[in-house]
């Protein structure tokens, strides 16, 4: 049954690249076969509950611009928001959604009230999922908005805050499991510091390690089959966050023996904030065996902060999905649109238009990436570049069968004098442009 929020808008359909209908897909066809697999199953799109239905449109210099009928902190409003959300998922044809606990339930005065409210809305979501076929990609706990978390959650100097946060995560894992969520995400928005003058880094990192171990232990205790994901971000809201980037998180996981238990949810905008390209973070996560899922958005390259805009750069998407496909594709992860409307985009249709554009952009990127893989457009030049390491002697060198003295003797006795070879960067950049 329609809520009426979207007026007479009908389910979004594919109309082809020549369509000028803003409420139609031009490139995204769920059933199109790409590399032997349905496009929908490659991309595994999800809608972010928080930016799409909870964000009021504020910024540091101005307050709310969106006037949504569910913007009240009551269970009645929470259920109306759920009605609109699941109608939106159906109109868009998104197979998945994601949420924080605070996005979906009213804020209670106590932990017990929060748990009661979450359980009630989870039961409501379960009915909605059954009726629409929409699934939960991942759930998570908001451990950053409430004032109790102003000094962190897991890294807070107050052990009672640590305990409250841990108990909250338990309820959110339970909710995620009940709804069939395929992943559970941890994002440390306040797990960092503003100044070292009042911060014991060593203690806070140890607290964070204990917290993450508790999560993994509980996952196994209850038999949750989903993947635990960490989402890196270098700063904002804190000056420096401990989950800075892929490399930093990997070192943290290794220290605590969790590199085989936890994978990463990598956001394009966060990669940019860390001074990396999106494809760098994806390639590194693949190389380290910790790639899990992605949050798809973009930042304004001039502003210097996290603007969470919908993706619109096909070459960037092509390179991103190239690394996703090259690593074997998503297992339990997917493409979550952690993107929000601009605060002047007031119309309900704008919510659909933003997602449609993002989905079309990702579809174009996926198809370009798949074609590059099928043609070995990048993999063959890469293999040629490193071909010298395939020789028997080079393999022994790589496996550590020669000492430094033996290597030196080889260089001297064979008069080794290697000459540099072209890296062909311009050629490869031109190759990519042929596909996009």
Swiss-Prot record:
Q: How and how many cofactors are bound, per the record note?
A: Binds 2 magnesium ions per subunit.
What reaction(s) does this enzyme catalyze? alpha-D-xylose = alpha-D-xylulofuranose
> Which HAMAP family does this chain map to?
Xylose_isom_A
Q: Record's Gene3D superfamilies?
A: Divalent-metal-dependent TIM barrel enzymes
User: Family assignment?
Assistant: Belongs to the xylose isomerase family.
- Record's signal peptide: none
Query: What's the name of the protein?
Result: Xylose isomerase
EC category: isomerase
